[in-house]
Amino acid sequence: MKAIIIYSGKGGVGKTTTTANIARLLAKQGNKVFIIDADINTPSMNTEFEGDHPHEMIWVHSSGNMFSKFIYLEKSMVRQYLELAKKKIHSINPDYVLIDTPPSVTNVHIELLRSEER
C-alpha cells in the first residue's frame, strides 16, 4: 500500500479536486483507492463523487458534519477519527491511500504525521 498526502497551506487551490482526480485515475488502472478526507471541519470529498459514488474501486472516509460545531479540534478527537480510518483501511486493503488535507497547519496535520510513525 502506498500513501499520498495532498497538501497546500492555502485553501481553495484544488486539493480536493486533485485528490479525486488522482483517485479516479488510479481506479481506472485497476487499483483500489481509499481516500481520507482529513479536512474534517469542512469535508467536501463526498461531493466530488456525487453521481458515481460509491465507486467499486474508491472508498471515501469523511467526517461529514460531525466536527462542524468545533472551532478547534483537540488532538484526541483527530486521533479517534484517524484510528477509525485505519480500521477501514485494514478491512479494505487498498493499493493506495490518498489523504486530502485542510489548509494551513492544524492538529490534523500533526496527528497524520504521528500516525505515519505508528
Language model features by range: what are they?
Residues 8, 35-96, 103:
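P-loop/Walker-type NTP enzyme "switch/lid" segment
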Residues 23, 82, 86-89, 110-113:
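Short amphipathic alpha-helical segments and helix-helix/interface helices
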Residues 2-40:
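Walker A/P-loop phosphate-binding motif and the immediately C-terminal alpha-helix
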